[in-house]
A protein has these predicted regions:
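Acidic, surface-exposed loops and disordered segments
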Residues: 1-417
Length: 417
């Protein structure tokens, strides 16, 4: 089959068939389960995923789907409005997709501008998935990422099958720092019309230090913040994590459903010490200080960097970067029929007092805890998704009909004739 025919085949797979057929199929070609009731050694050699298979998985998990609508009464003035195949609280998202296979370690370039409302509208445009994969894939190093095969960083029940030859392991890494800065501003500044009541912003207090003001004394005194509306800092940081953690989870689930459509095996897993994996990926770990127990993974230089020092000289600069109002290119496409002038009428922007208060809180966190965020890491690797070719002999031996579907049965003949 041609690439176009394979794309059409993947596109035609029914969504609800994928939802109800989805299973964790952990045993791949060339794998060995050394113990237990399903002890088995594959008689086949591993077969790596093809370029088009990886492209479809990447496109399903973290593809750029077109212009985000932002159909809100108070639209945000984002320069880019690129929608993704996963839901996110800002265009482009807070998550970078890394992946490793037998050939190397890669990252998907997220600096992509949407060209129209729906990037893929016709069958002829489905080749964009493959074109985007080729254009956005950036090689970071040669060879498979070496993840130590012991507890931790791996879970004990995944030692035998995770990151094996022939597999592709997808590692979505999310950034909490920018989310936290944005969320702090939304809690303190009524001008943003999010979580700060019109009568005064929330009084963010440090509940890990006796509920003292988190650097906000000036704004409490002048009434910009409502002293009676106390909000613990730990809850704000937790909420910032909630905002972001849904992204990698959805990326993995999208890929999981795509494996069903393509007839591949795989599963989403976690339960590891991500700090060690991030370090092996080349992430910068800022040494613990100010009472912190562990170092803070803040980014991969020049690839994916948190909104905090050392990538920003100060927390003031980090806040400014998050709220920088870079004008949208005059020729950039928009999803709406109205003029840009009409659209800007409802746009919201942080107020000068809100910006100053946000900076004060962020500086308090960094100065008090020696890191930003204070109670969690800047970068997180919560889940990974592995895809591989299943060994149907294994499933035929141990399981009844239905252990895998028609797409799995026909996969090698269809995709690797």
């Amino acid at each position: 089959m041609t690439a176009s025919e394979l794309l059409d085949l993947a596109w035609s797979y029914p969504l609800f068939e994928a939802l109800y057929g989805r299973r964790s199929r952990r045993f791949g070609l060339g794998f060995e389960m050394p113990e237990g009731p399903f002890r088995y050694k594959s008689a086949h050699t591993p077969v790596p995923l093809s370029e088009i298979e990886e492209a479809l998985l990447v496109g399903a998990g973290a593809g750029f789907s077109g212009l985000a609508l932002w159909d809100l009464p108070t639209p945000a003035p984002y320069r880019r409005r690129s929608g993704r195949t996963f839901p996110t609280t800002r265009p482009g998202g807070h998550t970078a997709l890394f992946f490793t296979n037998d050939e190397g370690l890669y990252v998907l370039d997220a600096n992509v501008a949407a060209s129209k409302l729906r990037e893929i509208e016709t069958p002829d445009e489905r080749t964009k998935v493959l074109e985007a994969y080729r254009a956005q894939r950036r090689e970071l190093r040669r060879g498979r990422l070496d993840i130590p095969r012991h507890i931790l960083p791996m879970s004990g029940h995944d030692l035998w099958d995770s990151n094996r030859p022939g597999s592709t392991l997808f590692l979505p890494v999310c950034d909490v720092s920018a989310s936290l800065i944005s969320l702090i501003a939304q809690f303190v500044d009524p001008a943003l019309r999010r979580y700060a009541p019109a009568g005064g912003g929330m009084n963010i207090v440090d509940d890990r230090h006796g509920c003292r003001p988190a650097g906000t004394e000036r704004w409490l005194k002048d009434g910009f913040l409502d002293a009676e509306r106390m909000l613990p800092l730990s809850i704000v940081e937790r909420q910032a994590c909630y905002y972001v953690f849904s992204e990698p989870a959805t990326i993995c689930q999208n890929m999981f459903l795509a494996t069903e459509a393509l007839g591949l095996g795989g599963w989403k897993h976690c339960g590891f010490l991500s700090l060690e994996i991030l370090e092996r990926m080349g992430f910068r770990i800022v040494a613990a200080n100010g009472g912190a127990t562990f170092g803070n993974p803040v980014g991969l230089d020049g690839v994916f960097e948190a909104s905090c020092p050392p990538y920003c000289p100060t927390m003031d600069a980090a806040v400014d970067a998050v709220f920088s109002q870079t004008p949208r290119e005059a020729t950039a496409p928009v999803p709406y029929r109205m003029s840009d002038g009409e659209h800007r009428v409802g746009a919201i922007r942080i107020s000068p007092e809100g910006l100053a208060c946000t900076k004060a809180i962020c500086n308090y966190i960094h100065d008090t805890y020696g890191r930003f965020p204070g109670g969690t890491d800047a970068m997180h690797l919560m889940w990974v998704m592995q895809a591989h070719h299943i060994d149907t002999d294994y499933y035929d031996r141990f399981f009844g009909p239905g252990a895998y579907g028609p797409a799995h049965a026909a996969h090698m003949a269809t995709w690797h004739p």
